[in-house]
Amino acid sequence: MTRLQLASCSAALATLVLAGAGTTARAQDAVHEHRCTGQWRVTNDERITSCTVLIDSGRYQAPNLAILHHDRGIALRAKGDLAGALTDFAEAVRLDPDFARAFADRGSLRLAQHDLDNAIADLDTAIRLDANDAGAFMTRGNAYDEKTDFDRSIADYNEAIRLSPTYGAAFFNRGLAFRRKGDFDHAITDYDQAIKLDPKNASALNNRGVVWFEKGDFDRAIADYNQALRVDGNFAPAYNNRGEAWRAKGDTARALADFDRAIQLSPQFALAFDNRGLVHYQKRDYDRAIADFDAAVRFDPGNAAAYGNRGNAHDDKGDRNAAVADYNEAIRLDPKNARHFYDRGIALRRDGDFDRAIADLSEALRLNPQFAGAYNERGYAFYQKHDFARAIPDYDEAIKLNPKFAIAYNNRGNAFDDKGEPDRAIADYNEALRADPSYAAALYNRGIAWRHKGDLDRAVADYDQAIKLNPTAAAYNNRGSAWLAKGEPERAIADLDQAIKLDPRSADAYINRGNAKRERQAFADANADYTHAIELSPNAALAYYNRAWAHYLAGENVEALADADRAIALNERSASAYSTRGLVRERLADNAGAIADFRKALEIDPSFRQPAEGLQRLKAAPAAGSR
């Protein structure tokens, strides 16, 4: 946003009586005085020249010599020679320690140089010397505002307004201070007054729009930006800000048009590039987003947010190294911003580096203990480490901070379900859906929990709703599996066909469709699906086990034995694979081998009836300790 700058005024020379000065010299001095003090419209160079002639003439004493140095300082500052201006202001106050205007203008210059403490010291002196200088109060208010001491800045703006009730710039700057303090209502009142005093103040209209935006009233914000642009059709900040309001309303087309116009008017407008990049990011056009973020950091290398945004685009594009590099730079530039640690933590978690992810998310929480999202993400990192004892308390804290945090309820439900507590899981999925009735993932996960409880009808009902909201391959796959468990292989195959259509690389869907075909005794077709699953996932023990079972049912003992061997090699804790191999060996009259396999299956799963029945047939006892 724009801050109005205080325009410095030149001091007037006192009437001079110069002993011994000739008429011609006096006339020449008068010309230079008019030029030096700004009474005539001249260039800064002409003004500096005239001031220098008078200063070097030796004909002036304090306080008039102080005025000449002050006015030359004004011209030097206007030319951008801040060091020269500072030297002249210093000489002015040395020559005349009661020269309030010189202290005020040196304070203003020091403020421009961000030398805030010395600026305030000068302005304190200026105000002590002239307590009616509204401009000095205004400038000191600006200095306190830059120090983020908003109460003092507002007090100074109050005094400036008391001294000059029509001082529009003071209302404008007090509005800025109230906004930065988070007092949006008082900020709007001040902008109202600034606009009343100057209805064509595009900056005040723009800034009032920003406050409406921050209050969440996007329509009023847009109305103010529209009015600012009617006043000044080339005001790039208003286009940028209106674009942000359109983006917040979900109108990406209008947002892009406004950001385009802002950049056209101001080709190095880093913030507009950053904001346009965010629109492209939301549209998942990561290449365009990254190009805009590139421009944002090129034109503003200190913009930590733009580095963070570019990191997000790289991360979602799958380029974790580039993402982490950007987050590193964002953290270097803004090490107290919890969001950058949070984003880097997510990238590291996605890369499987759970310990470093947890460290980053912990730092985010140290910086911002109220960051519910960071608790949720750290909980998810613990969950992926199968550390449910740490995951669940983090989800608890996320929910405590945000009782409507649907994702945290869903994630805690997953942890409970994986712990074997489907009832608690279902309770959490219910809460997630209460917070967000269109949350397809919570319906999908609740369906899994119902399946774990053996309630296939409720599982199918949840998958139905999940598919209506978001028809994913996983939802079709799980519903197909549920139909199969309900004894409806035809409906299962229809769902699994759709799952494979949506995700042709889903080994699970091929395995489940193979199982459905096997139930129909279409063993060759089933084995074709299992084979495809193995091609997609060569270490899928479940695919080998199921193909072994299909071969066994088809009487293909050699093939069944080979697949059972491979399933066991990939998963030594598969009771089903041992039991199947035991059946094949029993059929091949390898009773010793069959007994060994049945015993191993029972050792893994003592409740498994199939190997127990095999041992009974072979009149063999289970292994010691297996029951």
Please annotate each region the language model reported.
Residues 53-56, 60, 91-94, 125-128, ...:
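Conserved structural position within tetratricopeptide repeats
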Residues 63, 97, 131, 165, ...:
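Short coil turns that delineate tetratricopeptide repeat
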Residues 67-77, 101-111, 135-145, 169-176, ...:
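Conserved alpha-helical positions within TPR/SEL1-like repeat arrays
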Residues 23-63:
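N-terminal leader/linker segments that initiate helical-solenoid repeat arrays
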Residues 30-35, 587, 595-627:
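Terminal, low-structured helical/coil segments at or just beyond the last alpha-helical repeat
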